[in-house]
């Protein structure tokens, strides 16, 4: 990960910690891809994609496409399989964007 990417992710982690999320993992990788942040709140497991950068062509979050979401689901399934003691009732894929100006937009997705 590049330095800017780490800065965006650190800001996203702070955002979630300030809202009482428990960060379970960061940059969890599997052969299908990576999940930037895995967090837990109110028995919901959040698989979070962080996007950062300029808003030249709209919010950076809009760069998340269906292919990326499928990768997150595959990696999420692997994470769950390798963490059987983790207790949760639902799974949700979320996207958070951090612009170069520090603006944070959080897009909680539908629960799976």
Curated annotation (Swiss-Prot):
This is UPF0102 protein Pmob_0702. Coiled coil: none annotated. One of its GO terms (molecular function) is nucleic acid binding. Belongs to the UPF0102 family. SUPFAM superfamilies: Restriction endonuclease-like. InterPro entries: Restrct_endonuc-II-like (IPR011335), tRNA_endonuc-like_dom_sf (IPR011856), UPF0102_YraN-like (IPR003509).
């Amino acid at each position: 990960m590049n330095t800017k990417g780490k800065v965006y992710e650190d800001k996203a982690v702070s955002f979630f910690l300030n809202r009482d999320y428990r960060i379970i993992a960061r940059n969890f990788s599997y052969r299908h891809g990576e999940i930037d942040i895995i967090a837990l709140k109110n028995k919901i497991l959040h698989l979070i994609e962080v996007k950062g950068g300029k808003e030249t062509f709209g919010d950076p979050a809009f760069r998340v496409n269906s292919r990326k979401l499928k990768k997150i689901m595959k990696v999420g399934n692997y994470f769950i399989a390798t963490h059987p003691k983790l207790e949760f009732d639902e799974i949700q894929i979320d996207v958070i964007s951090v612009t170069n100006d520090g603006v944070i937009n959080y897009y909680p997705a539908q629960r799976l």
